[in-house]
């Protein structure tokens, strides 16, 4: 019973950390990375389709993404979708390839993205703490129902706290890495 609660808490905290990684991937740095375009949706025969389903995104060099669109009639729609996204990118079409140069980040945009990264990290921290609270409440309920002793509850609570500290530490490391990435010129 106790192990199930701890395992569930660990899985949920792991998912929170994974979600933070996805959120950080959407925050643009000065370098080209295919995941930057993950949020772009293309109007494909009337339906909004993720860009990855209509084009192959590769890194051409450190500041340029290259897109190979599968259906040549979709080149205009893909280009328009990238332009209208809130990423601030200006694609250039060369034949069947769309090149997306990454503009250099200004000091102001770097600070804005850093602020956004900190907000995402804080949201992840709050989520991890809520998971801890839920796990501790489940343990307290078990103790009230006399299914576990007070000592077992305290030990399991300490384990949940250690797990929380571990994941908060990982969130901090991820945030530091993202901030360093954003501030690198």
From Swiss-Prot:
What protein is this chain from? Ribosome-recycling factor
Organism listed in the record: Pseudomonas paraeruginosa (strain DSM 24068 / PA7) (Pseudomonas aeruginosa (strain PA7))
Gene name as annotated: frr
Q: Which HAMAP family match?
A: RRF
Q: Does the keyword Zinc apply?
A: no
- Mind giving the lineage of the organism this protein is from? Bacteria, Pseudomonadati, Pseudomonadota, Gammaproteobacteria, Pseudomonadales
**UniProt-recorded Gene Ontology molecular function terms:** ribosomal large subunit binding
CDD domains attached to this UniProt entry: RRF
Any signal peptide, and if so, which residues?
A: none
- In which compartments does the protein localize? Cytoplasm
